[in-house]
Amino acid sequence: MPRPLACLTAFALTALAASPLHAQEAAELCKAIGNVTLGQWASYTMSGGQADGAKIRLAIVGQERRGDSTLYWFEINGSGPRDEGIMQVLVPGFGLETSGIRGMVVKTGAQPAMKLPDQMLATVSQRMAANNPALLIARRCATAQVVGWETVAVPAGSIKALHLKDSEGGEAWMSRDIPFGIVKAHSKDGEDLVLTGRGMDAKSSITEKPMELPGMMIPHQ
């Protein structure tokens, strides 16, 4: 995973793992930010540590109907001083359901976009459950320690957000009015993430047709 994407995961983990306080208030916020709409996006910059200068965008760039369910293409686009990459996953919803991956496309730098075969998705789902920032926020948000509501000044404007904090110094400011909820975050390692933009007109960052990645060969016993 490119460094910017890994750092966003770390923010979610360190800023949202905390002791319960005002659990109902946090739970309502986390439920609200879990509702996604086609086209929603939020962009961020990072400062401090190895991710200094990195940029990240989260977006819902597509949807598909399968049976009675609507699936969404959730995109994480990250770029930093040394690497860049795009990951798109087809999921039944945001938050806890993000672990149920039904499709995945990845693109690293100038390399061709690749679509992963279905037999690899179970393994990827397990990794997403542990590392995906959106999933971690939904899972940890409701049990975080609530400091209180604050007005936070970020490049995207002044936004009222719920301040969450953990015992190790990680912090996050969350708002139901922001796509994906994250307004600002500070990790225990001194890295900062701030919201730079948001909107409802996101398009896929992958414009080419993805190549089919061959499936893994399973040896016969």
Language model: regions and residue ranges:
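Acidic, serine/threonine-rich low-complexity disordered tracts
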Residues: 24-100, 107-221
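Sec/Tat signal peptide C-region and signal peptidase I cleavage site
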Residues: 19-23
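Bacterial N-terminal signal peptides
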Residues: 7-17
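Positively charged n-region of N-terminal signal peptides that target proteins for export
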Residues: 1-4
